[in-house]
Amino acid sequence: DYQTGSLRDDFDFGSLQLIRTSAIRHFLNNGRSPRYRFAGLYALRLFISSKGEIVHLREPLYSEIETDLRVSGQKQFDYVNPRNKEVQQEMERACAEHLKQIGAWLAPDELNELPADTTVYPVEASVIIPVRNRARTICDAVNSALSQQADFTFNVIVIDNHSTDGTAEALLQYAQNEQVKVLCPTRHDLGIGGCWDYAVRSEYCGRFAIQLDSDDLYAAPDPLERIVAAFQQQHAAMVIGSYRMVDFDLNTLPPGLIAHTEWTAENGRNNALRINGLGAPRAFRTDILRQIGFPNTSYGEDYALGLCFSRYFRIGRIYVELYLCRRWEGNSDAALSIESQNRNNAYKDALRTMEVQARQALVKRWNHPLNEEEISKFFDWQLTRWDEARERYEALASQVQTRVLPLEDGELRVQYNPSRIVSTGAKVDKKSLKARPCFLCENNRPDTQRALPVMGSIEVLVNPFPILPHHLTIPTRRHTPQDFNRFASLLD
């Protein structure tokens, strides 16, 4: 049934839909509905969903002849078919407009700085292969990973999820290979996501965790190198590559290369809420992945992480072929029943619902108005939790000095605090500034210093080196060149 997160444009309502005339008129006359060639009904549906409830009448009222007889494994890639590019661009535009109206759209510059990772890892990268009952393909996958050529250390972590078909026996050939770690969880309730979580939290996992499904292959000797380079070059917390659909004998199947070129730096993470997948292979910074954790499911676990990562961090993209996705009779999603499709779609809609709500809360927190009483309470609260700053404020009365400067028509009394020489005596030449971390950025601030977000892009901080009884610092939330015009609205 329809949820807040039912944002995919292929949501199947059936052919019979009843819409209030007043709702259509409201949509057409609201002054912000652009003209659409393909996305008109989709945009109307999103608009109505933001104003009221969409009800599913659970009663068969008509029948129709199904004309699209393709299996689910073929239909699921319609949105990346180049022939549908113009349609998809319109759908993306309609979805972005909807997200803006409901307060869930994230601007492209609203990205967290990547935290420093001081963890000591056994290797730089780990290829993660969850497996259950893939005796026919598991060794192909492991050998594909081992054939990678890289100028850094890497290993292969296989999680055998209680296979019963000879998979465990097939993996015995790697028992003496230090580069291959076969893990056997004691729990019997783990899905693919649970196996991933088990692997990335193990002592063997490297700095980057990189996907390889148990029936797939890497397309060349260098995907690991390309992925790790993308983390560094694109300053990303997650990297997604491109893959080609092939049969078991590696012959190309439609639609061929799936590169997700619809992704843009400007709107990719918003459009991710509309489409049903983000691509493969997927790779993660292990430290951040351990903080978020994998959902313990065997469907949509990767999509859930992509949404969560994109809420806070930049997702890097590689648009050249890295991966071969083999379609064969053993695939779990090659030809799903309508009941399974509905169940999977409902789960992803639920993921999107949670993500929309999380983004709405984030945007609301950023955009709440400036309030003098709230700032005063924040100031007092901060000093109760920051002993060093509180002591400086308590000593302020005895430390502050004044100096009288004579003027032609009177005098000017200047107040200053000698203890601030620690912060004001720093070098300000170009080289020194470039080498010094920005003390206003969240990752470089003391753990005890908190920020109060206000007015969209501004934060309020308590200054730890005061010259005033209530000394505040007001930077932008993101690291940008300071510009007085950004703060002009504060003076109104």
Residue ranges and their predicted role:
Residues 206-217:
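Short beta-strand-to-loop acidic/aromatic patch adjacent to the donor-nucleotide binding site
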Residues 2-18, 261-283:
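A recurrent flexible, glycine/aromatic-enriched loop bordering the glycosyltransferase active site
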Residues 186-204:
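Glycine-rich, basic loop-to-helix element that forms the pyrophosphate-binding segment
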Residues 360, 364-481, 485:
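Active-site microenvironments that recognize anionic phosphate/pyrophosphate groups
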Residues 143-153:
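Short, acidic, metal-binding catalytic loop of nucleotide-sugar glycosyltransferases
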Residues 1-4, 222-255:
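Conserved donor NDP-sugar-binding/catalytic core segment of glycosyltransferases
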Residues 35-44, 298-305:
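Acidic donor-binding loop at a coil-to-helix junction in glycosyltransferase catalytic cores
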Residues 160-169:
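A conserved acidic beta->alpha catalytic loop
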